[in-house]
Regions:
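C-terminal motif of bacterial Sec signal peptides marking the signal peptidase cleavage site
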Residues: 15-18
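Residues within mature, well-folded domains
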Residues: 20-165
């Protein structure tokens, strides 16, 4: 029993630490990067852009939200938003946007795959369609890293299994 308690204690503490960050109020424009990182923790990725720094806070691979904190050259917060939604996906332009553009707009994908016949790389993002439906957006890139198509549909990980296989 003591060994079981020793094993369960770190797991319980990790779960409680994760719960503590769920209800953190969002940072406000004008806050410093240090203040944002102190409040939200270490970002899942940091992007250096010509306009300033961007911090990614992804909840994946099974989360349905990615938050981007964008800072100006003065390291003050310009915007903080959830990007896995219709307005976020609308920023991606088929035939124009690159993998880097998608990474800076939507953050890291939940899944990556390759379709050999059309020779397309696919980045998949889990999200809530209209805030209700468990969905996935699939962004397809050609060999040059240009977006060629975007398809959305139900998230297979959240779909009810109707058959035995």
């Amino acid at each position: 029993m003591k060994n079981m308690l020793k094993l369960a204690t770190p797991l319980l503490l990790a779960l409680l630490a994760g719960c503590a960050s769920w209800n953190v109020p969002p940072p406000l424009p004008g806050e410093s990067r240090a203040a944002v990182e102190a409040r939200l923790g270490r970002p899942t990725n940091v992007y250096q852009l010509p306009t300033g720094t961007e911090l990614e806070y992804a909840t994946g691979p099974y989360g349905q939200a990615t938050y981007m904190a964008r800072f100006g050259p003065d390291e003050k917060l310009i915007s903080y938003e959830q990007v896995l939604d219709a307005p976020g996906f609308a920023r991606i332009k088929v035939g124009v946007s690159t993998q880097q553009d998608v990474l800076h707009t939507l953050g890291r994908p939940a899944e990556k795959s390759y379709l050999p016949i059309p020779k397309l790389y696919v980045w998949s993002y889990r999200y809530k369609e209209s805030g209700v439906w468990d969905s996935m957006m699939h962004v397809h890139f050609d060999q040059d890293g240009i977006v060629r198509m975007m398809l959305n549909g139900p998230d297979p990980a959240k779909e009810e299994r109707r058959f035995f296989w």
